[in-house]
C-alpha cells in the first residue's frame, strides 16, 4: 500500500515537471519575470521589473529605486 502511494506521488511529480518544462520551452520568453535570474548584460527583466544589483534577480520596479 505504501509503495503504490509512493509510485502515485512520484508519477504526479514527474508529470508536473514534464508539463512545466514543456510550458517553459513553448513560451520562449526573452525577458524575466519576478525573481527570475538576470545580469543586465545577456539576460534582462520584463517591463515593470528591474534587475537587482545585489541579488541578481528581477524585482518590482518602484519609484525611487535604481
From Swiss-Prot:
One of its GO terms (cellular component) is extracellular region. Expressed by the venom gland. Residues 1-21 form the signal peptide. GO terms for molecular function: ion channel inhibitor activity; toxin activity. Disulfide bonds join 31-46, 38-51, 45-58. It is found in: Secreted. Pfam families: Toxin_12. Its main location: secreted. The modification Proline amide is found at residue 63. It comes from the Eukaryota. Belongs to the neurotoxin 10 (Hwtx-1) family. 46 (Jztx-7/10/12) subfamily. Probable ion channel inhibitor. This is U1-theraphotoxin-Cg1a 1. The lineage of its organism: Eukaryota, Metazoa, Ecdysozoa, Arthropoda, Chelicerata.
Amino acid at each position: 500500500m505504501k509503495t503504490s502511494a509512493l509510485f502515485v506521488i512520484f508519477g504526479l511529480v514527474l508529470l508536473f515537471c514534464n508539463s512545466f518544462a514543456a510550458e517553459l520551452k513553448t513560451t520562449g520568453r526573452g525577458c524575466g519575470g519576478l525573481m527570475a535570474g538576470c545580469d543586465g548584460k545577456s539576460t534582462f527583466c520584463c517591463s515593470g521589473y528591474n534587475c537587482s544589483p545585489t541579488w541578481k534577480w528581477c524585482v518590482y520596479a518602484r519609484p525611487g529605486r535604481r
